[in-house]
């Protein structure tokens, strides 16, 4: 597999984040770096195809955003709704089914098969790499993951998820169960 390419600034990502930065609040820096890491992994799996770049960038900015916009532990559908609404409102021209699918299936345990399979599967694999902090590698080398993580450090992102599970669910255990039931797909 080719060396991983890391883009440290993505204009589209920064502009998409801008209206939501205050909503995300203190979790912004950690979430932003999570988004950059997952975009980096997904674009690697897609061979840096420009055909998918705008979709991947948009999907990852929005993929967890329902945690903050809707304060929801079952955040996939709220995240999809915000992404689809903004896609229509701002006329980005992204395929709504591909955008929805990349968000909806990013926690799927097993390989995604279906419409828009290539991009959805790349996004799914990318998020699993980052969600597990590299324990699941999906074919990437440890050194590639370490390289990406050194450029975009965690900055407490995974701890933020645990805090939100507790805040929204009443306890870390109950919140963790609600999150798992609400977002994991088979």
Positions of predicted regions on the chain:
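Active-site-proximal substrate-binding core of FAD-dependent oxidoreductases
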Residues: 94-102, 112
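Alpha-helix boundary/capping segments in eukaryotic regulatory proteins
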Residues: 47-54, 69-76, 89, 93
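An active-site-proximal "capping" alpha-helix that borders the catalytic cofactor pocket
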Residues: 38-42, 74-89
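Divalent metal-dependent phosphate-bond-processing catalytic cores, especially two-metal-ion Mg2+/Mn2+ enzymes
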Residues: 1-11, 21-49, 91, 108-186
